[in-house]
């Protein structure tokens, strides 16, 4: 598997693919996991900005959706609606979603009492110990009188699910989720979280905070559970596992270069830390990442520009 260290070192081939109809607005801000992608559309081209990259693509004929291409940069962007898929140098990035829209499919959950709502393309289902219920058609609307992105999912007349784009921490496992949820049902309100935790960390390069090395150690998570990065001396790759209980890494493979003593020491610290990781937290509006062992912080990282 080809290793990629950071967006600034990415190769020349960037492919974006997607699903749904062309965005209605001229400017669209996508969240591709933790990677922010800004798209500016016109009738003949689209300009994409992500990390420190800014690329202009020309419109091309397409049987479905909207296709844009920059052949010199070997870059394509095909989108339909609020969702898109980004691929860079053969590496598939997390699904890109317009930040003003909810994912077409997502789950919300809470504890004490347990509840779980699955929303899937306009329908929903509720799972509770007291019984299950299906909703063949639900209405999703944006709530306009809030400071952040908030949506109301109307399950039925007296049952609603509220989703807000603020990071939520599971009350039992401590797992972070990208959305905060509230289920209103039978004159009661149940709190919880929604979305997929991997979207908080995947798609960007995270650099070790306050490193004294010229090239700081870094790590990048992808939505297919692959992980790769730079230890301070060698490049590494492998897999991570994200469950409802926490985060862990499978054994990592690394190159075998010898480096200066301070680089070798940084590498040893990083590999030992990754071997002990059980949880993660994010902060500073998603720009910082802490890899933890229970309550102890092992690595502090910042989102690379």
Protein language model features and the residues they cover:
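Bacterial N-terminal signal peptides that target proteins for export
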Residues: 1-8
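C-terminal motif of bacterial Sec signal peptides marking the signal peptidase cleavage site
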Residues: 15-18
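Lipid interaction determinants
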Residues: 22-27, 66, 80-108, 136-140, ...
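Post-signal peptide N-terminal segment of mature Sec-exported envelope proteins
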Residues: 26-51
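Short acidic-hydrophobic surface loop/beta-edge motif
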Residues: 28-31, 68-69, 106-110, 151-156
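Central antiparallel beta-sheet cores of small beta-barrel/beta-sandwich binding domains
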Residues: 51-69, 117-160, 237-238
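Periplasmic N-terminal soluble interaction domains immediately after the signal peptide in Gram-negative
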Residues: 73-74
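An ectodomain-focused feature that recognizes extracytoplasmic/extracellular
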Residues: 100-124
